[in-house]
Amino acid sequence: MMTTVADNEQFSIDALELGPMENFIYLITDKKTQRAAVVDPAWDVPEILKLAEQKGVTITDILLTHSHHDHINGIEAILDKYDAQLHLLKTEAQFWGQHLDLPTLHRGGDRIQLGKSEIEILHTPGHTPGSACYHIDDQLITGDTMFVWGCGRCDLSGGDPNQMFDTLNKLGQLPEQTVTLPGHNYSDQTTATLHEQCEGNPFMHFHDVDKFVDYRMHIHDKVRHGPYHAELQHEHE
């Protein structure tokens, strides 16, 4: 299923929900040049290619939020069709350890030029050491760092709940009208503003890192089940 989640004079962002893990794959299109970037290509690549063809765009860039299999298993099929440049954080490439053909390795704060549109890459560790979010205008593609009303697991290889606490605090300082576009459809709505996240995402309610770590690692998965719903701030302070 395809949904247009952002559309203005300069760029558009379309979301495809694909695969058995309810992944969101995003296609960012620069309207002036008809260049497109696909974020976390995975699962049903023919659907991604079909969307690009329908829009009349050329995929020139692949942006990775992190290196888990469910976010990367379509890379080779995209590269078979398009001569696209692969982008990820250097920290994630080192964690991943895979041989990549001349990817562009970034540091947090770098900017990627997609035609006339500029995309900022943010280093958001926690789920993995080199997890990234992609910030374009008032849209924030968050991968498995932040879901609507949730955040990524920190118990897998490379996960760190202390880093996740710091990351979410930093994201919470972005403009409140920023729209978060998550890597999975785990919730009762597919997007949320940061204002809504700060109000309804329990992981945004903590001021004490130890309480956050205990909740993320030991409590959350026992008391919350999908689809996630907003939870107003209460005992987590």
Residue ranges of predicted features:
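Accessory terminal helices/loops
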Residues: 1-4, 8, 166-237
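Active-site-adjacent loop/tail segments of enzyme domains
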Residues: 151, 156-173
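Active-site HxH/HxHxD metal-binding segment of metal-dependent hydrolases
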Residues: 22, 33-36, 43-120, 199-210, ...
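Core dinuclear metal-dependent hydrolase active-site scaffold
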Residues: 27, 109-136
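Histidine-centered catalytic micro-motifs
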Residues: 62-72, 122-129, 181-187
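Hydrophobic "anchor" residues on beta-strands that sit immediately upstream
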Residues: 36, 85, 123, 140, ...
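Active-site metal-binding loops of divalent metal-dependent hydrolases
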Residues: 41-43, 67, 92, 127-128, ...
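Conserved beta-strand hairpin/beta-sheet module of binuclear metal-dependent hydrolase folds
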Residues: 3-55, 133-143, 148-149
